[in-house]
UniProtKB/Swiss-Prot annotation:
Its main location: membrane. Residues 232-479 form the CN hydrolase domain. It is found in: Cell inner membrane. This is Apolipoprotein N-acyltransferase. Belongs to the CN hydrolase family. Apolipoprotein N-acyltransferase subfamily. Gene3D superfamilies: Carbon-nitrogen hydrolase. Pathway: Protein modification; lipoprotein biosynthesis (N-acyl transfer). One of its GO terms (cellular component) is plasma membrane. GO terms for molecular function: N-acyltransferase activity. Catalyzes the phospholipid dependent N-acylation of the N-terminal cysteine of apolipoprotein, the last step in lipoprotein maturation. The active site is at E272, K338, C390. Keywords: Acyltransferase, Cell inner membrane, Cell membrane, Membrane, Transferase, Transmembrane, Transmembrane helix. The gene is lnt. InterPro entries: Apolipo_AcylTrfase, C-N_Hydrolase, C-N_Hydrolase_sf, LNT_N.
C-alpha cells in the first residue's frame, strides 16, 4: 500500500510538472515576451518525457501539450463564439478538442524518446523537429506557437537569417536539452566535470553562431528605393463588417482616410478584405479611386473579395490602384490572391456534410478558393512587394517561394478583428516580425483593428498604430537587396543537419553493437 501511494505521489508530481511547464511556455510568446520561459517549458517537457515509466511519460507529455495549446490558442474561441454563433461552452470545448489534437505531437515526441531510449543531446532537437514538421504539415498544418518565434528578441534571434524559425526552434530544444543534462550532472555526486565543460562548450557554440550571424551583412539597404507608406486602419467592428446596412459607413471611413493622404504619401495600404462587398459589384467606386489616385501620384493597395468568373473562383485578393503601368481593372495581372486558406474560416472541408450541422461551420466568407502557390510580386511605385494575406505570413516556406532577390518589401494585410482583444493578434504580429528577420526584408503590415506596424529588416518594430482605433500610420520604408541563407536554402540546412545527426547516431549504435557483440 505504501509503495502504491509513493508511486501515485510521483505520478501526480510528474503530471503537475507537465501542466505547469506547458502553461509557462505560453509566456515566452507575445504579448508577454518572456523568451526565457521557452527553455523552462521545454525543460519540463524533457523531464516528463524521460520519466522511467513509459505510460506516465506519454500521458505527461500529452498534458504538457494540452496545457500549452489550451492557453496558447484560447483566442480561437472568440471567432467561434462571437461570429460563429456557438455558445461560450461549445466554443471552449472546441478549443479543447483542437488543443487535444495538437497535444498528440508532444506525446509522439515522448513516445519516440521512450521507444528508442534516447539519451543523446543531439537527438532531442532532431525528434522535436520531426514532430513539429508533422504538426505543420498534416491536415494542411497548424504551425502556430513554434518556440523559435519566442526568441525574436533573444540573443539567439540571429540564427533566423541562417536557419529560419524551424532552425531557431531546433536550437531552442538543443539548448534546453543541454541545460537539462547540465543540471542532471550537477546534481550527481561526484560530479562529472568533463560533462559539465562539454555542455558549456555546446552552449557557447550556439551563442557564437548567433553572434556571428548578427554581424553578417546578408542584405543591404537601398536608400534611393525607399517609399513613404501610409497604413489605413479602419477599425471596423467584426460584428458590423458584414452587415449590408453598414457598407456605406465602411466606404465613408476608408474614403476619408484615403483622402487625408492622397498626394502626400507614395502609397496608401488598406487591410485584408477592407470593403465587405464583391469587388465586381462596386466597379464605379474602384474606377473613381483609380482616377483620383493616378491624378494625385499616390498608389493605393487594398485587400478585396474578388469573383474570378473565368475560373469560377471566389478569391481573397490584394489589388493596386493608381498605377500607370498597371491601370486597374478586374482583369489586372497586378493582383495577388491568397493561396493557403484557413480550414473552417475561409473554406469548409467536407462542405456538404458539415455546413448543415450548425452556424459554427458557417462563418462569414468561408467559401473561398485558393490562388496559385507561386505568384508574381505586386508592382507598386516600381517596387516589388511580395505579398501574404493574414495566416499566410506564418508560413515561411510558402513565402520563400515568392520572395526573390529583387523583392523590395514584404507586404502582409490582415483582419485580426476575428480574435478581439485576445493574445492572438500579438502572436500573429510576432510571426510577421520573424519573417522580416528570416528574409532580411522590411515587412509592411496593414490590419483592420490592429496591430498595424512597420517592421525593419532586423525584425524590429519601427512604427506602430494603436489597436482598436480608426487611424493612419505613415513611415518611410527603406528597401533592401540581397538574400539571407534561409531565403536561398530554406529549411534544407536544418533538415540536413537533423538527418546527419540521425545517421551519426545510427552508425554509432551499429559500431557499439559490433564491438560488444559476443563472438561465437
Amino acid at each position: 500500500m505504501l509503495h502504491y501511494l509513493k508511486k501515485m505521489k510521483k505520478k501526480i508530481f510528474t503530471y503537475f510538472i507537465a501542466i505547469f511547464s506547458g502553461i509557462i511556455g505560453v509566456l515566452a510568446f507575445s504579448p508577454f515576451d518572456y523568451w526565457g520561459c521557452a527553455y523552462l517549458s521545454l525543460l519540463g517537457l524533457i523531464f516528463v518525457a524521460k520519466t522511467a515509466e513509459k505510460k506516465t511519460a506519454l500521458w505527461s507529455a500529452f498534458l504538457w501539450g494540452l496545457a500549452f495549446f489550451t492557453f496558447g490558442i484560447n483566442w480561437v474561441h472568440v471567432s467561434i463564439h462571437q461570429f460563429g454563433g456557438a455558445s461560450v461552452v461549445v466554443s471552449y470545448v472546441l478549443v479543447l478538442v483542437l488543443a487535444a489534437y495538437l497535444a498528440l505531437y508532444p506525446m509522439l515526441f515522448a513516445y519516440l524518446i521512450q521507444r528508442f531510449q534516447i539519451s543523446s543531446l543531439a537527438m532531442f532537437p532532431v525528434i522535436w523537429t520531426f514532430t513539429e514538421f508533422l504538426r505543420g504539415w498534416l491536415f494542411t498544418g497548424f504551425p502556430w506557437l513554434q518556440f523559435g518565434y519566442s526568441q525574436i528578441d533573444s540573443p539567439f534571434a540571429h540564427l533566423a537569417p541562417m536557419f529560419g524559425v524551424t532552425g531557431v526552434t531546433f536550437f531552442v530544444m538543443w539548448v534546453s536539452a543541454v541545460i537539462f543534462n547540465l543540471l542532471s550532472v550537477l546534481l550527481i555526486k561526484p560530479r562529472k566535470w568533463n560533462v559539465v565543460i562539454a555542455n558549456l562548450l555546446l552552449l557557447t557554440l550556439v551563442g557564437g553562431l548567433s553572434a556571428y550571424s548578427s554581424k553578417a551583412e546578408y542584405v543591404r539597404k537601398i536608400e534611393d528605393r525607399d517609399l513613404l507608406v501610409t497604413l489605413a486602419q479602419g477599425n471596423i467592428e467584426q460584428n458590423l463588417k458584414w452587415e449590408p446596412e453598414y457598407l456605406y459607413q465602411t466606404l465613408d471611413i476608408y474614403h476619408k482616410l484615403i483622402s487625408q493622404h492622397l498626394g502626400k504619401t507614395d502609397v496608401i495600404i488598406l487591410p485584408e478584405s477592407a470593403l465587405p462587398v464583391l469587388e465586381n459589384h462596386i466597379q464605379p467606386f474602384f474606377q473613381g479611386l483609380q482616377a483620383h489616385a493616378q491624378q494625385a501620384g499616390t498608389e493605393i493597395v487594398m485587400g478585396t473579395i474578388y469573383q474570378d468568373k473565368t475560373a469560377n473562383k471566389l478569391l481573397n485578393s490584394i489589388i493596386t490602384l493608381g498605377n500607370t503601368d498597371f491601370p486597374y481593372s478586374l482583369e489586372t495581372t497586378n493582383r495577388y490572391s491568397k493561396h493557403h486558406l484557413v480550414p473552417f474560416g475561409e473554406y469548409v472541408p467536407l462542405e456538404t456534410l458539415l455546413r448543415p450541422l450548425g452556424s459554427v461551420f458557417n462563418l462569414p466568407m468561408s467559401a473561398f478558393q485558393s490562388g496559385d502557390e507561386i505568384q508574381s510580386p505586386l508592382v507598386v511605385k516600381n517596387r516589388q512587394l511580395s505579398a501574404a494575406i493574414c495566416y499566410e505570413i506564418i508560413l515561411g516556406e510558402q513565402l520563400r517561394k515568392n520572395v526573390k532577390q529583387d523583392t523590395d518589401f514584404i507586404l502582409t494585410v490582415s483582419n485580426d478583428a476575428w480574435f478581439g482583444d485576445s493574445i492572438g493578434p500579438w502572436q500573429h504580429l510576432q510571426m510577421a516580425r520573424m519573417r522580416a528577420l528570416e528574409f532580411g526584408k522590411p515587412v509592411i503590415r496593414a490590419t483592420n483593428t490592429g496591430i498595424s506596424v512597420f517592421i525593419d529588416e532586423q525584425g524590429k518594430i519601427v512604427a506602430q498604430a494603436p489597436q482598436f482605433i480608426e487611424t493612419t500610420l505613415t513611415h518611410k520604408v527603406a528597401a533592401t537587396e540581397g538574400q539571407t541563407p534561409y531565403a536561398v536554402f530554406g529549411n534544407t540546412a536544418i533538415y540536413g543537419l537533423s538527418l546527419l545527426l540521425l545517421l551519426m547516431r545510427g552508425f554509432g549504435a551499429l559500431i557499439r553493437r559490433r564491438l560488444f557483440m559476443p563472438r561465437l
